[in-house]
């Protein structure tokens, strides 16, 4: 239960039934056929309490990212979008830029946006050991949340969505490891390294 000064319960304004925080998304519960990329949040602010932000796995997705299906034994399969790693970094940066703008210039000036229907993501997953043997999968996806209005056949840009398996993924993962540590330490030029 979440209360404000007058002790009134504000939980329903803050949290979805799933326990995740509500943000500027469309939570109307419409059927799959009516889902749109624009249902997804852009600012990650709670509409009732705009001084509260939720990014990454903290915010409540408005719906899954693909058609709900069932396994042969009847288990419901409801894919959710990736809300960790690269997407979380972009969302976090968006929230920080908005908070900075609010503190510096006033309530609604310069609110940053980054919808998952407009952002891409990359992932490198190691599947072995060593930099001379084994393999890794390197994938990119754009946009993270499918947009069937912009890309009618697949919901995604086929030029920007692909994957490869091979040794290069290990080298990429090693390079990213050192780049992110460099960025986290705030070394010169850190801001040029993407999320």
Where are these regions (language model features)?
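Functionally constrained cores in energy, signaling, and assembly domains
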Residues: 3, 61, 132-134
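C-terminal, flexible cofactor-proximal segment of oxidoreductases
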Residues: 84-87, 94-195
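FAD-site-proximal beta/loop scaffold in flavoenzymes
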Residues: 5-88
